[in-house]
Amino acid sequence: ASGGTVGXYGAWMRSXSLVSXSTITTFS
């Protein structure tokens, strides 16, 4: 859940800085 998920979500996460910060930290 930290490899394929980050890759797929990383696409839309890059667009949303707000969500990125929050989601990136969780997956990272």
UniProtKB/Swiss-Prot annotation:
GO CC list: extracellular region
BP GO terms, sorted: defense response to bacterium
The organism's place on the tree of life at top rank: Bacteria
Keywords, comma-separated and alphabetical: Antibiotic, Antimicrobial
Job description of the protein: Antibacterial activity against X.campestris, especially strain G, and P.solacearum PO1.
Record's miscellaneous remark: On a 2D-GEL the determined pI of this protein is: 9.12.
Protein name from the UniProt record: Antibacterial protein LC3
Organism: Bacillus subtilis
